[in-house]
Amino acid sequence: NVELYVGSELDTGQILEFGFQNICIATGAGWRADGVSRQHVVPIPADAAMPVYTPDDIMAGRLPKGRVVIYDDDHYYMGGVMAELLAQQGCDVTLVTPAPYVSDWTRNTLEQHAIHRRLVLAGVRIVLNRGVTALLADGVETNCSYTDMREVTPCDAVVIVGSRRSHDALYHDLMARQAEW
């Protein structure tokens, strides 16, 4: 038998009180704002003056204004969704990705062409085969995926669609008390 406790946060002590033999934890993850992703295994150098957002911020209603660069190094659907939404909200959007296609993975689901088309029709500037190497006070430095040639794209804010960080504190707390299972 399986019992689900959806939307109820339990701490380690409460979970252990149940006396379960097996525990499955699904605590989710949050989008990283530091640029760690496929291109970067360490945070991107960033000037603190540049406002940085994640998909979590956008979905919570915290929206940038003005010229926005979306750095999509996730390659699934989220970068395209963020770009379209912000363009609809009146932002001047540039989507930068080191991939050769917008939302590259969606080529596997035959959606990539439609996503690219929608973004172009929404007025989004699409910059392919370029990564982001630094967040400056007034723009982002990008590099060519093939030559590493660099240039600066001026912007007022950046949305990073990169890696996610697991919410795994509960897991580690449980593992530290494994003898009590």
PLM features: what roles do these ranges have?
Residues V41-P43:
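Short boundary/hinge segments that flank catalytic cores
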